[in-house]
Amino acid sequence: MERSCSAGHVLAPLHHAARQVEIVAGHNSVASSRLLRPSAGVFTSRARGTTNLVFLLRPPGVYRADSDTSLLIDVMIAGGYAAGRRVLDIGTGTGALALAAARAGATAVTAVDLSMRSIAATWVNCRIHRVQCTVHRGDLFEPVAGQRFDLILANPPYVPAATNVVSRHRINRCWDGGINGRAVLDRLCTEGPGLLAPDGMMLIVHSAVCDENVTVRHLNDAGVRAEVLARSTIPFGPVMRLRAAMLEARGLIQPGQRDEELAVIAAHAPAGGPRVR
């Protein structure tokens, strides 16, 4: 795997987190372990009708691949969007999307995350699965400025939070999206199209709680053609359940609502590249 820092530097965060790694068996069953060993995440591809067991190391504070990850992978595989393409995974976490893109035939895969633990986890997971991936640490598109990609994948933090102040807790930063859930989403919409190659595509997954129609509108304003490609309704997870009362008070969900709709939004760049309006 190509990487921008030494193996020892990349792996250092895993050494400190070695006694708190989780073992994940599917989306809803989690067991704790004090041994450093890979997590096991099960992703079901509806496009192929098969279940692929993928072992992913997940240190504390790194986002655990979940239903939103699976939905985005399903869309990517069903559309054949990764095969033969240069792929960028923004906010890679454990590297689940980067791995899926490589397995789906991408010619080159780049992964970016601000978290050093996420970068370390992605580096190790790609080594485990013998996948070639260039890994960068940095803020969204900053490490790959000036480059162009045929496919950009993003599963950003999108859960509405009590404040726009960045949480001191590492794990909260995996899902906190600011007061309206769009702190990172809006940046993806404005900055992402500029990194798309002609005829390139960006796929973003997020909850309808932060309004997929706003995402479509912002992407269209950035000079690409946006549409919702897929939807899936799932029960609230632990974070959404804890914040349900706050979301109800803000009118973001209906009283008593305890499920959410996930949406995958596609942004299509024209043959000449994005056109700024």
Each predicted region: which residue ranges?
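Short hydrophobic alpha-helical segments enriched in small aliphatic residues
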Residues: V10, H16-A17, N28
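SAM-dependent Rossmann-like transferase core, predominantly class I methyltransferases
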Residues: P38, V42-A104, S115, A121, ...
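Conserved SAM-binding motif I beta-strand of class I
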Residues: A108-D113
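Conserved SAM-binding strand-loop segment of SAM-dependent methyltransferases
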Residues: R130-L140
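A short acidic, Gly/Pro-enriched loop at the edge of an enzyme's catalytic core
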Residues: F141-I152
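Mobile active-site "lid"/loop adjacent to the S-adenosyl-L-methionine
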Residues: P156-V184
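Conserved Class I SAM-dependent methyltransferase catalytic core
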Residues: R182-M240
